[in-house]
Curated annotation (Swiss-Prot):
A single GO molecular function term of this UniProt record: structural constituent of ribosome
Any one Gene Ontology cellular component term annotated for this protein: cytosolic large ribosomal subunit
InterPro entries from the UniProt entry: Ribo_uL30_ferredoxin-like_sf, Ribosomal_uL30_bac-type, Ribosomal_uL30_CS, Ribosomal_uL30_ferredoxin-like
Organism: Bacillus mycoides (strain KBAB4)
Name of the protein: Large ribosomal subunit protein uL30
Pfam families, per the entry: Ribosomal_L30
BP terms from Gene Ontology: translation
Family matches, as PANTHER family: LARGE RIBOSOMAL SUBUNIT PROTEIN UL30M, MITOCHONDRIAL RIBOSOMAL PROTEIN L30
Presence of keyword Cytoplasm: no
Length: 60
């Protein structure tokens, strides 16, 4: 079974490039301090890597 990751948006997307905004939205994060739980897949890990400066990640 794949590991679960708890992803929290900790910094605002205001003033960020459109591709970073789209990545945050694709992760399912809408507002500041919102949290989602996702499975650890290569696609999700790539998205996390792209916006790592805006989010915090913990194992769920």
């Amino acid at each position: 079974m794949a590991k679960k990751l708890e992803i929290t948006l900790t910094r605002s997307v205001i003033g960020r490039p459109q591709d970073q905004r789209a990545t945050v939205e694709a992760l399912g994060l809408k507002k500041l301090n919102s949290t989602v739980v996702k499975e650890e897949t290569p696609a999700i890990l790539g998205m996390i890597n792209k916006v790592s400066h805006l989010i915090t990640v913990k194992e769920a």
